[in-house]
Amino acid sequence: MRNRLRELRAEREWSQAFLAEKLEVSRQSVNAIETGKYDPSLPLAFKIARLFGKAIDQVFDDGE
């Protein structure tokens, strides 16, 4: 699943470690989500969207 996580994080000048702390996940998890190696659970996806003040479909794109 494609996502805008890296772009949104960069706009705020947040490190992966800072975002990971906010989301209560590892930095490696943030990296894996950003690179598309890991799709977040639905609760985590909603948490990410809320953190950035976006609708979930503004952060994640399933390619359809």
Predicted ranges, named:
Residues 10, 38-39:
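Short amphipathic helical patch at the helix-1/turn junction of helix-turn-helix
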Residues 3-22:
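Short basic helix-loop element that most often maps to the first helix and adjoining turn
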Residues 43-58:
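DNA major-groove recognition helix of helix-turn-helix/homeodomain DNA-binding modules
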Residues 11, 50, 60-64:
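Short, charged recognition helix plus adjacent turn
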Residues 18, 29, 58:
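Residues in the helix-turn-helix
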Residues 25-38:
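Recognition helix of helix-turn-helix/homeodomain-like DNA-binding domains
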Residues 16, 27, 45:
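Helix-turn-helix DNA-binding elements, focusing on the entry/boundary residues of the two helices
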